[in-house]
């Protein structure tokens, strides 16, 4: 057995162990002498050997070309890359949540603003609104729209009185239809609302000024109704008494105006009430057909007056 050792020459240590077997060959020659004088073949035997080295990785001790990573755990690079990717993903997720929440709040605030802007809370004539003191359906009765030919002259006053006075079934004091337009725009039910309609404010001030100028005595006695439909200091009695005194003095036109004023307030622009028989003749002369609630001016209205009448829902004759 032969051991081969390789000397170190600037390379890592390499240890190799080999084993070889050397077999000596021998040849034998048998010579026989025979009478035939023939020769036999030559027999030979030979063997061969090879060296196989074992490879071992070099040691980092004393080798400056190998990084000493003994203080770092295994897979440090993968941990660092995964951490950076996770932080980026969490940042994107947080940004998406914040933008979605902000967009939802903005959309909801815009919807609330638009619902308040286009709602009917500042008018007394269109639909039922939670901002109104009482539902709009309580302002009218079913038997208001009746033709003039179906009722007698005595019942015309009753129809006007029914339109002026409404009642409730819960035995609770309430404002009459005549006093309702005089109430404040910001009532107990909508005092928390910061939105005030300019159109409603104009209508309110216009109605208030006209009522105080044209019929101040009708504002002295409010109507307080109970469930039995009995009124104390009735507004209708006030109108009747003032109408009777006016008839005695020969002022038929003033009677018609006094009766028409509350009827106009109690009715909506789309609901027209029948007037008293005393003023039918003068109304038909001064108004267009089917319009009994608006007094035609003696002269052509100015643009500002026309705008006020248009805001109040009046129909002017050309």
Swiss-Prot record:
InterPro entries registered for this protein in UniProt: PRM
Subcellular location: Membrane
Transmembrane segments: 78-98
Biased composition range(s): Polar residues: 276-285
Source organism (scientific name): Saccharomyces cerevisiae (strain FostersO) (Baker's yeast)
Protein's UniProt keywords contain Transmembrane: yes
Record family assignment: Belongs to the PRM5 family.
Ranges of compositional bias, category Basic and acidic residues: 250-261, 309-318
Protein name: Pheromone-regulated membrane protein 5
Membrane topology qualifier: Single-pass membrane protein
Compositional bias (Low complexity): 238-247
Keyword Phosphoprotein among UniProt keywords: yes
Coiled coil segments of this chain: none
Placement of covalent cross-link Glycyl lysine isopeptide (Lys-Gly) (interchain with G-Cter in ubiquitin): 314
Residue span of region Disordered: 238-318
PANTHER family: CHITIN SYNTHASE 3 COMPLEX PROTEIN CSI2-RELATED
GO cellular component: cellular bud neck; fungal-type vacuole; membrane
First-listed, main subcellular location of the protein, grouped into a coarse class: membrane
Domain of life: Eukaryota
Keywords: Isopeptide bond, Membrane, Phosphoprotein, Transmembrane, Transmembrane helix, Ubl conjugation
Modification sites for Phosphoserine: 129, 279, 282, 288
Lineage of the species this protein comes from: Eukaryota, Fungi, Dikarya, Ascomycota, Saccharomycotina
